[in-house]
Amino acid sequence: MKRAVFLGAAAAVLFFPRPTFALPSLERHIRAIAHAMPGKIGVYAQTLDDRSPLVAYRARDLFPTASTIKVLVMATAYALEDRTPGTLDTTVTFSHASDLIGGSDFMSEQPDGATFTVRQLIVPMIQLSDNTAANMLIGHFGVEQINDVGGEAGLQNTHLARKFIDTAAIVRVENNVTTPADMGLLLYQIEKGAHEDIPTIASATFCHEMIAIMMGQTDREKIPGGIPPGVPIANKTGEITGTRNDVAVINPYGNTPIVLTILTKGLTNYEAASSAIHQVARAVYGSTIG
């Protein structure tokens, strides 16, 4: 009951109307960066104690999730563990013939027929963005159940339509979608639970565990590239043709954690997009430290 009350309140906080006078210089800066970028970018940023976002630019526009949806898959596992203890210890059997796809550096090294617990698959799915590990979890829980957990958490415009597929197919179609605001809400709940030791989308203990896993992310080229060295960041990236995404909690153990989600689509110049992501991250972080 407490979790349900929090989830409703969290959604209300996330979409609280932002006063027109709030951080106009940051808003203008983000818009200028977006207009100069070859493609579309959406940005959502919020601290835990603000009733309004630091910035919300195209925050409710739909974007391809790419691998950022794996955060929801992880959150589903922990939410279900709270409801049905033992969920994280259930096993899934790996088949080279039916499971292995591209973008699976960890699972490609595993023996055929090996068994993994749900918890064991979460780490490579997040930290290495292993697509096969993600698909094994999606198959285990089911697309509908993952979407249900997202819906219960207030993710109104996030939809997992299918498993991850080989790169050639991803180029043709990407129908897993979300918004910067939805991804912001998801990370807000995980960080809120961890930072304030309260149950949100999952118990406080599991929120701590999710943040710790994301702290081990190996792809640090996007949002972390715009943040000063040494600042802790828990993030999850995602890439497909025309899209470079990153969703993060900046300084998750500090006094003022920042949830920042940056989604893109229609990119024609990845170097320029990377520069734009760095500029956005730098501007958002700078706005909170004076």
Protein language model features and the residues they cover:
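N-terminal export signals
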Residues: 5-21
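Short, conserved catalytic-motif segment at the N-terminal edge
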Residues: 35-62
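Extracytoplasmic
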Residues: 38-40, 58-60, 66-68, 87-89, ...
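Mid-domain, small-residue-enriched loop/turn segments at the edges of structured enzyme/sensor domains
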Residues: 40, 114, 135-195
